[in-house]
Design a protein with these regions (language model features):
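Outer membrane beta-barrel transmembrane domains
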Residues: 51, 59-78, 218-325
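Transmembrane beta-barrel strands of outer-membrane/channel proteins
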Residues: 38-44, 107-111, 154-160, 205-209, ...
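Outer-membrane pore/translocation modules
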Residues: 113-220
């Protein structure tokens, strides 16, 4: 019974998150067992420090929280200054509805606030991002076993070009595609989420692959993949309060920007992040948090991935009926 409860709790935690912030693919919060849910997730991602330089997850003079838009400066080149950074902040409204016990529909509406600082020139743009719609099917659902419980979810979805992709500097120059609130392209993605629990211990493995289209300027981002591994332990404070600490690691890969189908090498992402997570459950409410820092990244001429922070709040409904039996 404890193992079953552990799997159910994990399904509503942010510990099943997997992400690629540059390419716009970010999955989870996964829901309470067959219960519809809604919530808000704030995620912060930073890139700081060229090859050979130290890194900070919160670069000097940057902000963890959203800041006022400022587009006084045109896109700038990279000259290796330690003060250079890119910061991506996203606030997401998330909803999930179970049509049937094994079939779920998901909606993510993001609002972006992106900042970059190059050559001592700081720019921030923001706005509604690209909306994600996706469906997941619970291929394996064994939650009533005495020793080991498992769940496997497979899904697919679309990222719609709802975000502005035309932001320009005061000089009339268009900012690069990944820095925009939207990519201007319709993209598709597939994912798998496997969770296993043994008594109070458990692990979650997530994998996603994203097929990126072109926008009107024939810009795109190369197809991307993300893998996320999370090992966790459930602590029962009392009947109403559960706490799940976790150790997390993720691997992200994309060859970066493309123009007219050709790879430019700009914003190439090939890195490993590791860190910790903490999820707290009080009745139907889930509070999630995580922090990851750079463990390894490929050599590029851009600031390297330095870290990620997420904060989430989810309410899980007491769903008794389904549209499809």
């Amino acid at each position: 019974m404890k193992t079953k409860i552990l799997i159910i709790l994990l399904l509503c935690s942010s510990t099943s998150l997997f992400a690629c912030d540059i390419c716009g693919c970010f999955m989870g919060i996964t829901p309470y067992d067959n219960q519809s849910s809604f919530g808000v997730l704030y995620r912060y991602r930073s890139y700081h420090g060229y090859n050979g330089q130290s890194q900070q997850i919160f670069p000097p003079y940057s902000s963890f929280s959203p800041v006022k838009g400022k587009n006084n400066f045109p896109p700038s080149s990279h000259n290796g200054l330690y003060s250079d950074y890119e910061v991506y902040r996203t606030t997401e409204l998330r909803g999930r509805y179970f049509l049937q016990k094994r079939l779920e529909l998901n909606l993510i509406v993001p609002y972006l606030n992106n900042s970059e600082n190059y050559n001592l020139q700081n720019t921030t743009i923001g706005g509604l991002g690209d909306i994600n719609i996706f469906a997941g099917y619970h291929l394996l659902r064994k939650l009533d076993k005495k020793i080991i419980n498992q769940r496997l979810i497979g899904g697919l979805g679309l990222k719609l070009p709802t975000g502005n992709n035309q932001a320009k500097s005061k000089q009339g120059l268009t900012y690069v595609n990944p820095f925009q609130a939207g990519t201007g392209s319709t993209d598709g993605f597939v994912y798998l989420n496997y969770i296993i629990g043994f008594k109070n211990f458990g692990a979650s493995l997530n994998s996603s692959y994203k097929f990126n289209g072109n926008n009107k300027r024939q810009e795109s981002i190369a197809n991307s993949s993300t893998q996320f591994l999370n090992v966790f332990y459930k602590i029962d404070i009392n009947e109403k309060l559960k706490v799940i600490p976790s150790i997390q690691t993720s691997y992200e890969f994309t060859k970066g920007e493309k123009y007219k189908g050709l790879e430019t090498g700009v914003h190439e992402t090939n890195n490993v992040l590791t860190g910790f997570g903490l999820d707290i459950f009080v009745k139907n409410i889930g509070i999630s948090s995580s922090i990851q820092t750079n463990t390894w990244s490929v050599k590029t001429d851009h600031p390297r991935s330095s870290g990620r922070v997420t904060l989430g709040l989810t309410y899980n409904l007491n769903q008794l009926y389904y549209a499809i039996n």
